[in-house]
C-alpha cells in the first residue's frame, strides 16, 4: 500500500466516529458483545478442528456455543448457516448440495455426512462469523454499535471496518464483489491480517515524519486524473472532497444516455478517472435542460480549461437500462456531450464490464453515512440524543399530558379490520413487538378500538398507523392555534446564525392522561392494544403538541426560538449569543426528558432548511425540491395535469415575478368554452416559468426597525402592490408582492376609487406588518388626486369612502405621488394579476353588506388554520397543491377558498357555531330564518353539513322560539269520548255568558245529556256561586232525571271549588274537566251553546232584553229537533214518545214505554250505534286538518301558546307568542300533558294542556343556554345556580315577569342580562360564590 493510500484511508477512518452513530436494538446485544470480544482479541474459541478427531466432539462444542448465545441462533437455519461457514470450500459445496437435495437435514447431520470439518485461521473465521449473521442485523447499525464497544485503538477499529465492509457483509454469491470496490480498499486488502495493522501503522507514522507536507498526489498514479482547483473552498473542504481519487486505474467507454423526461438521448462518456459529472453548454441548450447557479465555482482543468458556475438539476437518466438520478456541472467545451464519473457509478452500485463494454447494477448495499456530530461545546447534552436513547415510555409531565375529551361517552365504533398481506403482517408484528418492549403500548380490554393500516416511508419501508377517523368524530376539538408560517419567518429577521433541532418520535414523548388510554385503543389481527403515549392520527394531537412544545420552550420562543411542531429553529445575531441560546433550548429539552434526532439536526449554520424554505441572514427562498418539482414537469396532456402544474407554480408564486403574465396562455386552456389544443405558445409559457425558477429571488425578512415602502397601482381590471424595506446600502429590497382582480362591482368604480381600492387591499394583505408601525411608512401612488382625497378632512362622498377612511385610521403612513413610469413594479402587478385567484363577489355596494359581517382578521385566520389541523380532508388540501388545483381550490393568506369565493371550514366546530351566531343574532337582519340565514352565510363561507347546522341553531334559538308563530297544522288527532249506555248517565255543563240583561239575568246555565243530546236551559247571573249552581242543578236536573254517573265541565272556579266537590260526593258522581281553551275536548257542549245562541237570535233579535221569556220555547225547539248524531229527537229518546208541537197535531205514544222493555233496549242500542258512527265520521274529518302528534316525554321543555289559551297573556301585540319554557311532568291523556308551572301561577291556571297548545322547546346547551326572553325579566328575586357555557356565564334566576307583574317565573339568562335587571343582587351572588369574572 502506498503512503498516499494510507493517508486517504486514515482520513476516511477519522471521519467515522462512534459517538455520531445510531444505536442498535438491545435484542442483538449478545451478537454485539461477541464481535466486540473478537476485535479485543478475547474471542470465545470454539477450537481449531482437527479433521482426524471425532466429529461428535466438534458437534458438542458447537451445540454449547449455540446454547450460550441463544439470541444469535434462534432457529435451525442460523445454526446450519454458521456450520456451513466453518467448512472448507470443497466440504462447504458438498454440504450445500446435500441440503439442496434434502432440505430437512439438521446442522448435526450435515456435519456427520460431510465427514470432516476443518478450522481455519483467525481472520477467515472472523470473516465467516460476520457472513453467518449478515442478514440478522442492519449492517450500518451493527458496525456503529460495534465500534463504540471495541476495546481497541480507534484507528485500528476503523481500518478493520474498511476491510470488513466490502468483504464480509455481502451475500455469499457476491463474495468477490469487493474486487470492484474503490482501489484504496483493494490495495489495503493486500495486507488484511489484523495482526499486521499495528506494524503498518508504525511504519506510516515514521514515513509521515520524514515527508512532512508532501503532496497527496503521486505522479505515477495521477497521470490520468483530472484536478479540481477550487477558488473559494477551505483546505478542510478540499481534503474531504468526494471527487478526489489518486490511485484508481482509469477506464473509458461511451454509452447512449436516455433522458426520458426530455424525450432525448445523448452520447455519454463513462470515465472512471473523472471526478465529477459534466455536460456541455451546447447540449444543455439543444435539449433545454434546466440549470441553476452553483455557488462553489471551480476551474476545471485538463485539455479544455473551463470556469464552472452552473449545474443542472438532478436529471433522470438511463444507462443500459439502469435508471439513476444525478446532476451535471455545465462546461463550455468537452470532448463528449456529457461524462459520468466513477463516483456516480459507485454511489449507484454500477459495475463496469470492460470486456463486454456494458454496465450492470449490483444489489444495493446500505452505506455508512456520515452524520452530523454534536459539537464539543454541547457534549454535556449528549444524553438527550437519539444515539444514546432507545425509545421508551416517557415520564408524565403534570399539566402537559394528552387528554382525550369526548363529546359523548356512550359511543360505539364500527368493528372491522383492514385485510393485511403477509408482508404487512410482518411489519405489524415488528411494530407491536417494539411498542410492547419499549412500553409505549400495552394490551387492552377496551370495547371500542380503531383499525390499523400502513403507509410507506420515504425510504420505502412501511409505517404502521392507526386509522382514528371513526374516533375523531367523537373527540372534542382542541382550539390551540398552530403558528402561521409568515409570522414565524418574520421573527427570524436580523439573525445570522441558525441551529435546527428535530425531536425524535415527537408524539411519543407525551404521555396520555391516566384513564384515557382505553380511548386510544387499536385493533389488529394480534389483538387489541392501547397507547400510553400520544399517537399519530388523533385529530387533537397537532394542537396539543404545539401547546406542549410552546410550554416547554417558554419565553425562549418569543426571543430566539421558532418552532413548528417538532421542528425547532434557534436563531441568533452572533456566535457567542447563539451558544447561550442553544444551551438554553437544550437544557429545556433535557429538563422535559425530550430526545433530539441528531441525524436531522444542524448546528451553527449560516443557512438552514426549515418548514419548506431555505433561510439565511438575507431572507428566504423556496426549497430546491419544490423548484425541481416544477422544473421536471412534463408537458401536461389534459386539463387535470395542467391544473396540477399551475398548483405547483402557485405555491411558488411569491417568488415568481409577473406570475399571471407567464401563466396567461395556460389559464386560457382551462376556460370552459376553450377547446383543449396544446400549441408552442403554451410550451414556451412553461419554459419561461421554469427559467424564472432556475434562480428565484430572495425575499427579505420583514424588519420593523427598517423603513417601509408600499407601492400600489390599479389598472382597469386589477390592483397590485409591492412591499419593500430600505437596507444598509440605502436600497429597497422586496418583502413581498401582491395582486388581485376586481369584482364586477369594483370594475364600475371611478379611477380614484380604484386607486384607493389598491391601497385598501394592500393594507389588508400586509396588515400584520403595517398596522403596528411606530414611525410612519410611505405609500407611493401614481394617482395625484388620491392624495387629496385621503388627506382631506371633509365629509366623505359616500358610505364606501367613509368606511375606507375609517379603516385607514388604524395605520400610521404618509402618502406621496410618483408617476406611473417610475412605479413600474406595482403597475405591472396590477396589469398582470394571477388569473387563478378567485374574483370576490359583488357585495361592495349593497346597502346591507351581509358578507362583511365577519371580519377576516389575523385572529380569525389563526382560528381557521387551527381548525384545519383537525380536519383530515382540509389538512390534505392545505398541504397538497396538486389536490387543490384538481378541486379548483385556492390557498390565500392561509385560507382555503373555492371557486365560489367561499372560505372552506371544517364542519360543526366552535368556529362555525360562532359564525352562525354572528349572522343570526348580531347581524343587520333580525333573527333571519333558516333559508335566509343559509343564503347569507353561503355568500362567504361553506362547510359540510352547513344547512343542517344552521337549521339546528335556528330551531334552538330562544328568541325565535318564543316570538315567532308556528304555521304548521295543529297537533293531536281528535279523541272522541265514548257514549254512555243510557240517557242522563253522562252529562256536560257550561255557561253562556256575555248575554244582555233580561229580567235580572245575564247568563245561561246549559246542561246536556251526552246520550240523548237533550238540553236543560236555566237562566242565571255571571256572579252565580257554587252553592247556587248546585241548588239549581239539584232542582232542575236531578229532581227530574236522577243522579248522573259523571259530569264533564271546564275548569271554571265553580266546578273546582270545595262546595261543588262536596256536592258531587253527596250525589256520587265523578267530575271530569275539559282542557282549557280546547273546545274539541267537550265539543258537544260547545255545539249546543252555538245552537241555543242561534235560536235565541231568531226569536229576540229585535228585543234582545227579552231572551229570558223565550227560554222555554228555545229548549222545546232544541229537544224536539232530530239530532244528526242520533237520527232521533232528544225528547223521543228520553220519553219514548213525540209530543204534539201544534194544535193540529196529536202526541204519539209508544205501546211500550218501560225503559226495560225490549223495544226501549233496541232504541238505546240504535242510538249508541249512531253515536259511535258519528264519532268516527267526526274524527276522520277533524284529523284531516291536523298533523302527527308531537310526543313529549317527562322532563322535556315545552312552550305554551299565549294568544290562543290566554295563558300568561298580556293584551299587547308586541308580547311574545309563547310562554315558558316549562318542564313536562307526565302525560295525562292521549293528547294531554301536565306541566310543572311555577308556584306563583298554579292557582291561576290549570297545569294540564292539550298538545295543540304546546310547542317543543329546542334547547342545545352548545348553541344557546338562555331560556328567558330578556324583555320578560323584571325584578330578580333570587339566583338559584350558575353554569359556564363557551366562556359565557349563565344564571338560573327567579324573577317577576314584566309581561305579567303578578307572576313569578324562573329560568336561565346571561350575566349581562341579569346585571341590567338587578345589578345589586347579581354582584352579591358573584361575591358570595367567588366567581372570577
Curated annotation (Swiss-Prot):
Mg(2+) 1 binds at residues 502, 566-567. Processing of the polyproteins proceeds by an ordered pathway, called maturation. It involves the initial cleavage of a 27 kDa capsid protein (CA) from the N-terminus of the polyprotein, followed by the cleavage of a 56 kDa integrase (IN) from the C-terminus. This leaves a 72 kDa protease-reverse transcriptase fusion protein (PR-RT), which does not seem to be processed further. Mg(2+) 2 binds at residues 990, 1050. Residues 218-229 have a biased composition (Polar residues). SUPFAM superfamilies: Acid proteases, DNA/RNA polymerases, Ribonuclease H-like. Residues 209-229 are annotated as: Disordered. One of its GO terms (molecular function) is RNA-directed DNA polymerase activity. Residues 436-615 form the Reverse transcriptase domain. It comes from the Eukaryota. Retrotransposons are mobile genetic entities that are able to replicate via an RNA intermediate and a reverse transcription step. In contrast to retroviruses, retrotransposons are non-infectious, lack an envelope and remain intracellular. Tf2 retrotransposons belong to the gypsy-like elements (metaviridae). This is Transposon Tf2-9 polyprotein. The gene is Tf2-9.
